Amino acid sequence: MSFLKIIQGKFLILITLILAILGFFLYSTSTRKINFNPEKIARIEVFSKERKIKDINSPNKIDDIVKILKQLRSRTESVNDFPDLEKYYWLKIEELNVYIYENDKKYYVEVPYNAIYLINKSQYNKLLEIVK
């Protein structure tokens, strides 16, 4: 009888371990990241809601933007062409549209029909420093 309890206990531990690994795998693969080819980026066009602000051609500034964008992960899907806000910045990176904005004292990067990424204030300020 005790032999059966030992087998049941080991089986329960094995099932728990398998479920934990499966859960971690599903969690890590369900996050969205921005898909782009950083090596191909020669220029980033920056727009406000109303007009074009500037072109970013500096490799250092482009690298700074790319470093921030490559870190982003999200589970929140974007279902809009652009943010429904009065103030935002639009970055045109090759064929990719990226929006940067603040809403309710939180900071976001949004890629239309892909994802909405929550960023921290220092990332937001760094992006604004580059795009303004």
Give residue spans per PLM region.
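Function-determining sites in protein domains
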Residues: 2-132
